[in-house]
Amino acid sequence: MEAEEPEYGVSTEVPDIEELKTIPEGIMRSSQIPALDPEAQEDRDPSYKWTDGHRPVMNQSKVLRDMGDHTPNSMAIFFKKESSDMETSQEILLAEACNTPDQQEAVIQSLKDRLSRTIAAPELLACAVQEEWLDIPSKLDNRVGAELQSELMSLTLAVSKEKEEEETSPDTSIPRGSWPPCKTHPGETEQTQGSGSELLRQGKQLQLEATQENQGQEGFLQSQEAQGLEEQEGQEVEIQEEGTLNEGICFGGLLGEQEEVEEGFNGNEEEQKQGQIQSYMLLGGQWENEGLSGELEGLNYSERGQENRERRVWVLRDSEEEGQDQESREVEERRVATQYTENQRLVEKSEIVKRKQRDHDQTGKVMPVRDQKEVVDSGDRVQGNGDSGGQTAVEGSRPGEDSKPSLPVASVDPEVLSPGTLFPGISSSVADIPQIQKEPVCEELSPQAPALEPTEWSHQPISPPASFAPEESLDNRTHNSQQEEFRLRKGIEVVSASTSVAPSGTRDSPPFSPPNVFSSTATLSPVSSSVILPEETPTASASADTPHHCGPCETPPLPAKSSRYPCATSDTANPHSPLSSYTGVTQHLRSNSFPGSHRTEQTPDSLGMSLSFSHLELPQRPPKPAIYGSLTPRRNRRSRDGIVFSDSSTALFALKQDSEEFTSNPERPSSPHGSPTWGSPQNSAFAIGSPANVSSPPTVSMDMTIREALLPIPPEKRHSYSHIVERDGLLHEVASTLKRHSHPPPLTLSSGLHRSSKGSFSLVPDSTVARQHRPLPSTPESPNHTQTSIPSRLRYNKPLPPTPDMPEFYHPSISSSYISRMYRPLPPVPIIDPSSEPPPLPPKSRGRSKSIQGGVIHSGGQAKPRPNNQDWTASTLSVGRTSWPPATGRSTESLPLTSRCNNEVSPGLAFSNMTNLLSPSSPTTPWIPDLQRPTTKDESGLTEESEPPVRGSFRRSAPQEEFNNTRRSALGSRKNSEKPLHHQLEKASSWPHRRDPARTSESSSEQVVLGQVPNKQKGWNRQGLRRPSILPESSSDLRNPAAGRLPGSSDSVVFREKKPKEGMGGFSRRCSKLISSQLLYQEYSDVVLNKEIQSQQRLDSLAEPHGLSSPRHRRKALVSSDSYLQRLSMASSGSLWQEIPVVRNSTVLLSMTHEDQKLQEAKFELIVSEASYLRSLNIAVDHFQHSAQLRGTLSNQDHQWLFSRLQDVRDVSTTFLSDLEENFENNIFSFQVCDVVLNHAADFHRVYLPYVTNQTYQERTFQSLMNSNSSFREVLEKLESDPICQRLSLKSFLILPFQRITRLKLLLQNILKRTQPGSSEEAEATKAHHALEKLIRDCNSNVQRMRRTEELIYLSQKIEFECKIFPLISQSRWLVKSGELTALEFSVSPGLRRKLTTRPVHLHLFNDCLLLSRPREGSRFLVFDHAPFSSIRGEKCEMKLHGPHKNLFRLFLLHNAQGTQVEFLFRTETQSEKLRWISALAMPREELDLLECYDSPQVQCLRAYKPRENDELALEKADVVMVTQQSSDGWLEGVRLSDGEQGWFPVQQVEFISNPEVRAQNLKEAHRVKTAKLQLVEQQV
């Protein structure tokens, strides 16, 4: 490679360049557009003439400056046609200028620039451009011939001087205007001159390639505008190309002419044409037509003009879509002719470029390998200028694609496309760019969205060297770029030849789309763009508008105009395009997202360019859904128009580097035709300067989803060509699937980019720079590029903001050895059964990029294993493939091609866009952990660089890829699997795995393809449940091995709390897959009960009778704060069975009756409530009982009394819930719970009975500790303040078991009420309900027994008998009611006067006797009388006493202690007390017939009530009670319908149910339960 590199000492004819600066406007235009020799000009299409006639709006001064930088080459080109003498002199000058590899590379760059400019109007070239090419060059020669001739000598001298200066100071940056023209064989010049048709072929090939990439963007450019633009470009480019002869390449015929004129002077333009053709081919022909049109229009018009043209392009594109077939045929014919001519020319142009060029002037000359490399470099730059060059190449190679006339897109002004602008390596301004590498930026650019909005980058004239980072001398960069261009040219010549060989009629390459054109144009002039970037002209390259050269590849979006164009530039820039040639650009491409290890460091300028390119705003119309670069660059990479900079550009750059490793370099023998892949249409995409190198057919096969706005190019036009980028003569096959827009514009594949240490400016940026420039991968959900997947035009119109990962933008001075390290290609992704499963999401952390690094780049079907030492075979990426490493082992054939790539899938790079890698694709295999191994030292830079972008793109790409999935009908299988399960991240965010992607991705072992995740039940819990209530014991519990996601993220949710640190005694719990509880049971219970109350209230209000009942019975609103309800509102939303996605999305609900749905809801509530209950138990056990601090404050006895057997209760609940969930999962639509309850009834009895029985002692112990143990109190307060407790006290946790068992009985009762009478399900529910009822009865009995025994013991100590004594303590005796009353006695005085006396009497009513006692001091009682309960009777007093004696009742003792009858009159303080005593003294009543009590009032409990006396009824929220009597002071006596318990309760706790229908329904349900229970009892008997 070094031998082929231009010599530093070779002087360049800078003086000529300077003279050219003063050349007339027409000359400048010609200089800007690759100047063709007279013959070439004659061959050029009328569009070229039109270009001559129309000078672009861009400032000519800038063009002149750019020309000044590139003048020698441009002038040489102009002089070509002037006379054979001038041709000879030009050839001499070119030879001299290109004697050194640097010069040769510069020539290549100039050719590429020209090619890129020409590519601006690829279809123009592809269409009628051929005829006008020749004419236009002649006109240009006529106008500027004299001046060019006069200045030719000076230019020659300047070139010589420049060469000398280069020799003297190869490392120093070449001053603007002194850029050493790349050495071009005289044959090249002659070939360029004599083979207008050849140039046309090459240009059209480039156009075809560019069209493929620019198809969506520049495909709409009118051939006329493109031609006119080409003319202007040709003229301006001639001037600029004189400075950048190597960069100029004919795009189609126009560029062919221009390049021939320039090549006549330098012989490099033709190489550039070839390079552009290759770039254009890489662009897939889209950029060819659109790129040429776009660039030409950009040259001819100001940014506004470009925008207008883009709008026209859009309109034309629309019309083009209508007449797409006809235009396609026409374009294809033109392209076929052009491709054939250019292919012949390229093929014939071998090492003997001059002879073959001359021989094939008319038939199409094959540029020498060197020239081809130059063309490739220039093509890279052309791609940088806009993949128009590549499109032209594509057109030439795939005329079929060009058959469809692409609507003209606003062409880039010739100034913008000026050699300096387009090919920094060639132009002085390019020389100014120290780190400009000739990496194919066009890949990314080419895949940009369809017709870009006027891409101002293309308009921006080449900026002076100062505009670029001075870190690396222009000379060095020029020399390096020239050297690399030379190497590329050699390798690319072969490629371009083969590329051009691609049948012009091939419809596979899509016509240029205007957006692509701009992007290609920008890409084609990446160098120029870089140079232009310094320029402040609005049409300046992306870098001009955006400080992208200095910024990371993901540079922030450029201004509306320039940024759009820069984006286009980066996207469409050929790997060899000038921008691509920028070291920074190349680095950007590679470092950002391309897997290749050879990421070159972008120069500050190139970085800025690439960034700007990535942010170029494309035309408002979104590109067609073509598959763009595989890797999605950072968000910045998407242009405003939605164009995503193709990672393929980056990939191409990486490929170029890898191909350097894999394919023959100049060092590695690579015959001009050495790379057959290059020869193939796909390879031709990577032909010299063809945008295909960057956005080759893969780019052409840009994500159609992305290019949705663009008219979909016919599949035949979109047929992808294997993209092989030859860096340093190496061929690199770029996956057709690469999304040009996904990646930052790849640096041109110029040899300078890849040469180890030759270039004074290091091509490799620091790892930080690379990271910054690495494009973010697309969302794993969608295989399509996230960025490219944006279907709407608007989405394309919005440029993504730059997301540089590193503050450093670039490190221009990186040693080539370091470059080789950094750019070492990644190991190939192992090819796994493509149909097996899509790759899992790579970890978001560094592991992801690392895993990505371990791959090979598959160039030319060759896979070079990377350091991972893994036997991976690089699978060619399908056109639509976006994942960086293709879905492991996924071949391009595995995926149906998008419409653009119907005919063939390019072998492509082993790694496609990283986004695809991240995005799960259906047929691909899961990500292999080996890929995630730590990256090697060489790969570390790449990994670090790619890592941040991966995250960014991953985040951004989700929605985009969702859209892509929908858009890509061809990729149906992939789309199905790729559709976010969150198509959801849920919002992907709603999905648990979306909410926490890091955890799922971080564990590579658990990574799985999302497409493989069972779709059985999507996490219904997201409908309302905030989070899993219980954390599994281990991650394995929560993560399904297949899904590798959190339980919340998966279709199921686990109701599990973390096990206590101490463990659960070896008891393992099953993780729930479908149930999730986010609330503690205390809160959940409140929510559920509130729901029941509200439901009852709604029913009551809806059925409210017209006539109101008693006003005092009007319903009361539930009293609770709004905030509290809001805090508990989520539980209800997550506890509905019908809200489960599987159920909601099924048709089962349609076939179910309302009652059946209610039954299912009742059963499901039992499961959900148990999960919440278990969550609370886990906190009680783990947080409180197992607290070491709390345990230290308690004695063993206290600890035992306090927590009793709480842990046993938790274990039983765990198994119960596990069985419930398993039963539910087995049959979601008809699951059963009653049988599970019956199976666990014995366990419930075993643990709940002792725990509840001990509740009395538990309460006392707790109260005693709170009163006497300060340390306990302090520790407890601390524990209760923990957020896990949710401000709930320990006491609330301790009483949960009894509350739960009671509630469980009610839940079973609800199920029983909804079962079909006589059904087996009813029998099961009845048995379960009866079992729980018995358990509750036993618990109550035990609790009461203990309490009663204690009361008896206490009373026995306080009571004394003055009468007959009898034993008080008895197991069968309990206290029913006690209280102090006022006994009224009337005594008869001696005067027969009745005297009323009162005395206090304390009554103790037991269940079997009544004690009457007199209170004494010390709470002691003296019993004066007693009677058995059977002999007592109470009744109301009918006496109407006045005064305070109102609440009186009579007590009759039929047989007292003495055996006599006694009567007492008692007075109470309140009426309720009187009624309560009378009721207590009354004999037990028979059970009421509920159906006969329809007129009895009913109340519903709003607030729980804890009884204070034994005759009071304990109430729970939502209890319905039938009222039997009511006092005037606010007390009610009633019977609870659920269990028949009777008692008194305050009216404040309840509300009346006024609707008789609701009351009747309540009675009916209660009767149903009672009847079922009775039937069960009878059966058991």
From Swiss-Prot:
Pfam families, alphabetized: ARHGEF5_35 (PF15441), PH (PF00169), RhoGEF (PF00621), SH3_1 (PF00018)
Matches recorded under InterPro entries: ARHGEF5/35_N, DBL_dom_sf, DH_dom, Ephexin-like, GDS_CDC24_CS, PH-like_dom_sf, PH_domain, PH_ephexin
GO CC term (a single one): nucleoplasm
Domain PH, first and last residues per copy: 1375-1488
Domain DH: 1158-1342
Composition skew (Pro residues), residue ranges: 829-843
Signal peptide start and end residues: none
Record protein name field: Rho guanine nucleotide exchange factor 5
Source lineage: Eukaryota, Metazoa, Chordata, Craniata, Vertebrata
